[in-house]
């Protein structure tokens, strides 16, 4: 047996399938039509130029002609211009950069910028490098430092059982070092590499260099030109294996570092056009084709596509005169075939003859799950994913071959407006090249992302042959050839495979044989505002319906007017279904003609029905239809009271990959459904997909979708629940996973439940005190346990500024149509650490269908550090923020300034997740709610029975800090008592806040005011004049006022405090340290420390004016601590200054030593005195404690205080103090990592969009 297996040839043809599409047969017939002369734009995560198979074409040309990042995620602001001194410049990282003498720069001017590597590293690479850096750079050194610190601590503890006061500090020092090292390990965070970037003009072209070694020696780094000039690229190192190229824009002021954002794009390009000269069996479908790599997946958004990236990409596609676009991306859209992005795609296709191929989506098996643009845009060829028996053996190593099938997850049509959705299908899996940074040569991936480039490569073969033979073609003729020659698989439904599996050889023959002008035309089919007839809801199929269908020819761009005039098509219209009636003929000229089609679905059985009305040119009927009118009708099953609103099926047989669809008319009043699946098989476990979709006009299918992939064990049972909309048809689909082996039998039931609330969203205004809502059990007896939970509070922001300007050279559409941006700036305060979700309500949830080009927000802290970003789908971009102030910059782009100006006051919201959820009390009648008595618990509602509930307001002490008028809380209302009902039937709740209650004033202040009233006016004037002079004393650089007031008010403490603050805040502070000490002593001497200590020791104060006394004593203590700390800081600075001057020759060195000893004694005394009154980690004391530790060279204690200072005030200067202490302690690894954080935490400006 083993010998037989090893002798069997390896099925290489199944690794990257070409046989199924006729590509292999075509290349056997025409080996030179292998894609030569064809340029494919791959709009994806970017293509790695160093990946296997991405170097050359079959005729020796560069495989990748250009690599472009249109997202902006790799952009570096290089507007800062410097000139070297002595061959060196200081980069924005702070590193000294050595300019090699071999560089040519006639102007001597360099544009510099900085970029954090983790900003553009792919997520998987970032995670790998973080792990490797910790294991190789951090862990070995840190473990040794921690072991040494523990050893010293242990030795000291053994030698000093009863330490003195001085030894206590040494013990604390050693303990601090151990504590800090442990803390650094817990808080370890890798900033990643930080690269200095240089751009300059060498007299002929722009060049760029990135300091990838991070040591400033630029001779080690690669100098690059724009990739298109010489196909140059560099690599960030042997560990990363991340290849990169550059593009330079705006006269050197902007550098784009282009890397792949993921493995997806390289895999796609390898399928379409990979070429392996030594291993031709590994070739892509069109190895002779060239690639234009355009990165449209924004690394900042986890490679999500953006409007900016897509529109810039289409500009590049047009400018490079591409023949084909492969786009293996897409999202669900609220309305098909519409929006700015789709408009730009349509323009590229119809005006520039660019064939646009895209994935249909991976959201099946339910119908109408095609994504945008692949399955919803008229100009795009949407490709479904097919799996063949050879693929099952070669790629998936299945034990046995199964019949060819569509992947379970491949999206199905029709689109919401009736178009077929899926145009054609192609193999949806491959083992192909991936980027080098993955450390793999190849990888198995599947999806319509893989079927699209397979089809695209096949089309490239066709175009290669047509170009070689000078056969003219249009996007319309190529699409018609593909659809009319595709092979339909009998066991696969039309909505999954479209017109069938593409056949490259037959499509080529079709185009060579059918060269008439009519075949080069496109045809726009419209049914009102739709592109087909789609009858799905019960009301639509209850009676016959007439539909006016418009058919209009679409001419290729630059068609002569004479040809438009001469167009006269004699068309035959056919339908093969008895339930559809249409005219038999149509005369079509250069205008939109309308015909009437009648659809009568009354006699159709329950389920799904599809047919087409096809239009044939009677001059060449064998060429197939010129256009099709797709017609879909769904006849839904009904469930009613007699069946307990259940649909039950027993002992249902499932083969591998088999799908069973059930269309059900959801009963009016139903709000959720429960599905229960039971296995009847005792020997086979089975994988199933449970999928349900309801369509609502102008809502994407995902808005009312349920999806569950489950593994059902032998004789196992599972139950799931999902929300439904009453009165509309729902498709419930249960599908056996495509790769499952053996047959299986199951029972399953779909049961409907209904608890209807009067409002689809509950809006509660706290000002009303009590809010009512009513509930009805619509279908059957239901157990209720109403519960309202609030999980977030929402802050509404208005822009502080709105600035509009034209964008750069990358943002000009054909015919010099300039694009513009508006940047809106918002500020908000985060009251405490927590998770936030920013969003723009007007534009969010809109991407392809949006009328604006794009939206992108970036959030910054007060130091302009980028904290996070997001775009159209806010739920994907939640982030955790610490307490502080933040700025949000929102970019919106459009071609018309007037449309942008309308948004200059656009509101923006920030949703703050509550650390603890809040609940509202619910009562069954108004009186109970008014008195705050018995809350509603559990009750059972009979069918059709109505029950009111009353909600009371949230107590004021529960309102989150920072929330106020204009803010609201969000959460949900659940009504069902069952866990399944709670999970599925959820009603959104908004709770609107009002102003908080006015707090009563402090009684002590009132008493103070009363005592002030008793003073006569002259006394008041004298005191006011005194206080005014004290106020101005601190602003004037003079001692005159102080001396004057000291004579008049020798015992007035605030005067001495003001003098101390005046001296301590002066620019010449270091020259007046002795005066500061004297001023501090004056303050201290005017405080009765004994009386203060006695008061603090009191447990209670029974005196009637206790509040006033407490206030006065608190002020005295605060003043005393402040004076001690300022005195201590002045003494410490004096000693640190002297330490810096050690070694200097001086005649009075002995006198200085005595003075230093005296100052040190005074410092020590002040330190211990301070500890009597407060904790060393008090905010006021931290600076003094830090400086005291420095004087005593106790760097561990110093670093502990310095890190606390950073927490309180995270300035760059405070961080530099920490770094200095880390170096003094010998912890260079900590210092190095912290130094790399500085340019990230304190960038010179906001990052570019």
Curated annotation (Swiss-Prot):
<protein>
    <recommendedName>
        <fullName>Tripeptidyl-peptidase 2</fullName>
        <ecNumber>3.4.14.10</ecNumber>
    </recommendedName>
</protein>
<feature type="active site" description="Charge relay system">
    <location>
        <position position="449"/>
    </location>
</feature>
<dbReference type="GO" id="GO:0004177">
    <property type="term" value="F:aminopeptidase activity"/>
</dbReference>
<dbReference type="GO" id="GO:0005829">
    <property type="term" value="C:cytosol"/>
</dbReference>
<dbReference type="InterPro" id="IPR046939">
    <property type="entry name" value="TPPII_C_sf"/>
</dbReference>
<dbReference type="InterPro" id="IPR022232">
    <property type="entry name" value="TPPII_C_art"/>
</dbReference>
<dbReference type="InterPro" id="IPR022229">
    <property type="entry name" value="TPPII_Ig-like-2"/>
</dbReference>
<dbReference type="Pfam" id="PF12583">
    <property type="entry name" value="TPPII_C"/>
</dbReference>
<feature type="region of interest" description="Disordered">
    <location>
        <begin position="998"/>
        <end position="1017"/>
    </location>
</feature>
<dbReference type="GO" id="GO:0004252">
    <property type="term" value="F:serine-type endopeptidase activity"/>
</dbReference>
<keyword id="KW-0031">Aminopeptidase</keyword>
<dbReference type="Pfam" id="PF12580">
    <property type="entry name" value="TPPII"/>
</dbReference>
<keyword id="KW-0720">Serine protease</keyword>
<keyword id="KW-0597">Phosphoprotein</keyword>
<feature type="compositionally biased region" description="Basic and acidic residues">
    <location>
        <begin position="1003"/>
        <end position="1017"/>
    </location>
</feature>
<feature type="active site" description="Charge relay system">
    <location>
        <position position="264"/>
    </location>
</feature>
<dbReference type="InterPro" id="IPR048384">
    <property type="entry name" value="TPPII_GBD"/>
</dbReference>
<dbReference type="InterPro" id="IPR036852">
    <property type="entry name" value="Peptidase_S8/S53_dom_sf"/>
</dbReference>
<comment type="similarity">
    <text>Belongs to the peptidase S8 family.</text>
</comment>
<feature type="modified residue" description="N6-acetyllysine">
    <location>
        <position position="401"/>
    </location>
</feature>
<dbReference type="InterPro" id="IPR050131">
    <property type="entry name" value="Peptidase_S8_subtilisin-like"/>
</dbReference>
<keyword id="KW-0645">Protease</keyword>
<keyword id="KW-0007">Acetylation</keyword>
<dbReference type="InterPro" id="IPR023828">
    <property type="entry name" value="Peptidase_S8_Ser-AS"/>
</dbReference>
<dbReference type="Pfam" id="PF21223">
    <property type="entry name" value="TPPII_Ig-like-1"/>
</dbReference>
<dbReference type="GO" id="GO:0005634">
    <property type="term" value="C:nucleus"/>
</dbReference>
<dbReference type="Pfam" id="PF21316">
    <property type="entry name" value="TPPII_GBD"/>
</dbReference>
<dbReference type="Pfam" id="PF00082">
    <property type="entry name" value="Peptidase_S8"/>
</dbReference>
<keyword id="KW-0963">Cytoplasm</keyword>
<keyword id="KW-0378">Hydrolase</keyword>
<comment type="function">
    <text>Cytosolic tripeptidyl-peptidase that releases N-terminal tripeptides from polypeptides and is a component of the proteolytic cascade acting downstream of the 26S proteasome in the ubiquitin-proteasome pathway. It plays an important role in intracellular amino acid homeostasis. Stimulates adipogenesis.</text>
</comment>
<dbReference type="InterPro" id="IPR000209">
    <property type="entry name" value="Peptidase_S8/S53_dom"/>
</dbReference>
<feature type="modified residue" description="N-acetylalanine">
    <location>
        <position position="2"/>
    </location>
</feature>
<dbReference type="InterPro" id="IPR034051">
    <property type="entry name" value="TPP_II_domain"/>
</dbReference>
<dbReference type="InterPro" id="IPR015500">
    <property type="entry name" value="Peptidase_S8_subtilisin-rel"/>
</dbReference>
<dbReference type="InterPro" id="IPR048383">
    <property type="entry name" value="TPPII_Ig-like-1"/>
</dbReference>
<feature type="modified residue" description="Phosphoserine">
    <location>
        <position position="915"/>
    </location>
</feature>
<feature type="domain" description="Peptidase S8">
    <location>
        <begin position="9"/>
        <end position="508"/>
    </location>
</feature>
<dbReference type="GO" id="GO:0008240">
    <property type="term" value="F:tripeptidyl-peptidase activity"/>
</dbReference>
<keyword id="KW-0539">Nucleus</keyword>
<feature type="active site" description="Charge relay system">
    <location>
        <position position="44"/>
    </location>
</feature>
<dbReference type="InterPro" id="IPR046940">
    <property type="entry name" value="TPPII_Ig-like_sf"/>
</dbReference>
């Amino acid at each position: 047996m083993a010998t037989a297996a090893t002798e069997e040839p390896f099925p290489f043809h199944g690794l990257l399938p070409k046989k199924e599409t006729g590509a292999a047969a075509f290349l056997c017939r025409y080996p030179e039509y292998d894609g030569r002369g064809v340029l494919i734009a791959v709009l994806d995560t970017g293509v790695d130029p160093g990946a296997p198979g991405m170097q050359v074409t079959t005729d020796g040309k560069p495989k990748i002609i250009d690599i472009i990042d249109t997202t902006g995620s790799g952009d570096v602001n290089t507007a800062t211009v410097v000139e070297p001194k002595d061959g060196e410049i200081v980069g924005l990282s702070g590193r000294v950069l050595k300019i090699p003498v071999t560089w040519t720069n006639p102007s001597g001017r360099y544009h510099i910028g900085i970029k954090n590597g983790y900003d553009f590293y792919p997520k998987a690479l970032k995670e790998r490098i973080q792990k490797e850096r910790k294991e190789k750079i951090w862990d070995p050194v840190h473990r040794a430092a921690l072991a040494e610190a523990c050893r010293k601590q242990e030795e000291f503890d053994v030698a000093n059982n009863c330490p003195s006061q001085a030894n206590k500090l040494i013990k604390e020092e050693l303990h601090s070092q151990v504590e800090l090292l442990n803390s650094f390990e817990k808080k370890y965070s890798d900033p990643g590499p930080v690269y200095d970037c240089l751009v300059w003009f060498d007299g002929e072209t722009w060049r760029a260099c990135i300091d990838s070694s991070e040591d400033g020696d630029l001779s080690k780094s690669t100098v690059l030109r724009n990739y298109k000039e010489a196909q140059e690229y560099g690599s960030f190192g042997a560990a990363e294996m991340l290849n990169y190229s550059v593009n330079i824009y705006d006269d050197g002021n902007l550098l784009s570092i282009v890397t792949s954002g993921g493995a997806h794009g390289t895999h796609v390009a390898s399928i379409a056009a990979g070429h392996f000269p030594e291993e031709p069996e590994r070739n892509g479908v069109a190895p002779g084709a060239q690639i234009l790599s355009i990165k449209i997946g924004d690394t900042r958004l986890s490679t999500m596509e953006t409007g900016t990236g897509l529109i810039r990409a289409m500009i590049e596609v047009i400018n490079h005169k591409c023949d084909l676009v492969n786009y293996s991306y897409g999202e669900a859209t609220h309305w098909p075939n519409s929006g700015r992005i789709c408009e730009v795609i349509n323009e590229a296709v119809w005006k520039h003859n660019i064939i646009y191929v895209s994935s249909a989506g991976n959201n099946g098996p339910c119908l109408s799950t095609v994504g945008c643009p692949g399955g919803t845009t008229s100009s795009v060829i949407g490709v479904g994913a097919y799996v063949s028996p050879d693929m099952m053996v070669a790629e998936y190593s299945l034990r046995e071959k199964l019949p060819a099938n569509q992947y379970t997850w491949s999206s199905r049509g029709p689109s919401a407006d009736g178009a077929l959705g899926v145009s054609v299908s192609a193999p949806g899996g491959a083992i192909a090249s991936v980027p080098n940074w993955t450390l793999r040569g190849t990888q198995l991936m599947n999806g319509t992302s893989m079927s699209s480039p397979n089809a695209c490569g096949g089309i490239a073969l066709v175009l290669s042959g047509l170009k070689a033979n000078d056969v003219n073609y249009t996007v319309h003729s190529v699409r018609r050839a593909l659809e009319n020659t595709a092979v339909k698989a009998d066991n696969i439904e039309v909505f999954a495979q479209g017109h069938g599996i593409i056949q490259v050889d037959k499509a080529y023959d079709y185009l060579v044989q059918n060269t008439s002008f009519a075949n080069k035309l496109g045809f726009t089919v419209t049914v009102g505002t739709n592109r087909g007839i789609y009858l799905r809801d019960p009301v639509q199929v209850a009676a016959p319906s007439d539909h006016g269908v418009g058919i209009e020819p679409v001419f290729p761009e630059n068609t002569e007017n004479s040809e438009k005039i001469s167009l006269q098509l004699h068309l035959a219209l056919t339908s093969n279904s008895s339930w559809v009636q249409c005219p038999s003929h149509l005369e079509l000229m250069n205008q939109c003609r309308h015909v009437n089609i009648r659809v009568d679905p009354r006699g159709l059985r329950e389920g799904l029905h599809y047919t087409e009305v096809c239009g044939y040119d009677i001059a060449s009927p064998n060429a197939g239809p010129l256009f099709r009118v797709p017609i879909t009708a769904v006849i839904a099953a009904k469930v009613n009271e007699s069946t307990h609103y259940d649909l039950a099926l027993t002992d249902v047989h499932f083969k591998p990959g088999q799908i069973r669809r059930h269309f059900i008319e959801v009963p009016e009043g139903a709000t959720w459904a429960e599905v229960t699946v039971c296995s009847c098989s005792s020997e086979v476990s089975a994988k199933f997909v449970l999928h349900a979709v309801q369509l609502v006009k102008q809502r994407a299918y995902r808005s009312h979708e349920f999806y569950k992939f489950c593994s059902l064990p032998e004789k196992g049972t599972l139950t799931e629940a999902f929300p439904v909309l009453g009165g509309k048809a729902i498709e419930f689909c249960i599908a056996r996973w495509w790769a499952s082996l053996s047959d299986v039998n199951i029972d399953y039931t779909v049961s409907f439940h209904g608890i209807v609330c009067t409002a689809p969203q509950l809006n509660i205004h706290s000002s009303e005190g009590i809010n009512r809502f009513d509930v009805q059990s619509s279908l059957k007896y239901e157990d209720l346990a109403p519960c309202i939970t609030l999980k977030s509070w929402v802050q509404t922001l208005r822009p502080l500024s709105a600035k509009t300007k034209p964008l750069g050279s990358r943002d000009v559409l054909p015919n010099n149509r300039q694009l513009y941006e508006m940047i809106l700036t918002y500020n908000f305060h985060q009251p405490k650490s927590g998770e936030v979700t920013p969003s723009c309500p007007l534009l969010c949830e809109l991407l392809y269908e949006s009328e604006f080009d794009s939206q992108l927000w970036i959030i910054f802290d007060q130091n302009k550090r980028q904290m996070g970003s997001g775009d159209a789908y806010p739920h994907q971009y939640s982030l955790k923020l610490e307490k502080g102030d933040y700025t949000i910059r929102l970019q919106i782009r459009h071609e018309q300034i007037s449309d942008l100006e309308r948004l200059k006051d656009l509101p923006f919201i920030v949703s703050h997740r509550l650390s603890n959820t809040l609940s509202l009390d619910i009562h069954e009648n108004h009186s109970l709610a008014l008195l705050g008595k018995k809350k509603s618990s559990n009750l059972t509602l009979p069918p059709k029975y109505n029950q009111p509930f009353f909600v009371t307001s949230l107590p004021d002490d529960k309102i989150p800090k920072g929330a106020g008028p204009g803010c609201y809380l969000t959460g949900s209302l659940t009504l069902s008592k069952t866990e399944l009902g709670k999970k599925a039937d959820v009603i959104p709740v908004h709770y609107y806040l009002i102003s908080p209650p006015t707090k009563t004033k402090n009684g002590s202040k009132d008493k103070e005011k009363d005592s002030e009233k008793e003073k006569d006016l002259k006394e008041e004037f004298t005191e006011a004049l005194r206080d005014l002079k004290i106020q101005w004393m601190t602003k004037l650089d003079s001692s005159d006022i102080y001396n004057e007031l000291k004579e008049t008010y020798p015992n007035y403490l605030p005067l001495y405090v003001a003098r101390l603050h005046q001296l301590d805040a002066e620019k010449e502070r270091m020259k007046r340290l002795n005066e500061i000490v004297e001023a501090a002593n004056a303050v201290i001497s005017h405080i009765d420390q004994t009386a203060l200590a006695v008061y603090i020791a009191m447990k209670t104060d029974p005196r009637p004016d206790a509040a006033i006394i407490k206030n006065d004593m608190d002020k005295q203590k605060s003043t005393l601590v402040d004076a001690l700390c300022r005195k201590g800081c002045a003494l410490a600075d004096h000693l640190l200054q002297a330490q810096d001057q050690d070694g200097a020759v001086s005649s009075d060195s002995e006198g200085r030593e005595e003075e230093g000893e005296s100052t040190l004694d005074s410092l020590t005394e002040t330190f211990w005195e301070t500890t009597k009154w407060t904790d060393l980690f008090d905010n006021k004391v931290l600076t003094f404690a830090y400086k005291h530790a420095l004087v005593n060279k106790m760097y561990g204690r110093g670093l502990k205080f310095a890190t606390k200072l950073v927490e309180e005030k995270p300035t760059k200067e405070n961080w530099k103090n920490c770094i200095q202490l880390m170096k003094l302690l010998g912890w260079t690894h900590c210092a190095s990592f912290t130094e790399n954080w500085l340019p990230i935490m304190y960038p010179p400006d906001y990052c570019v969009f």
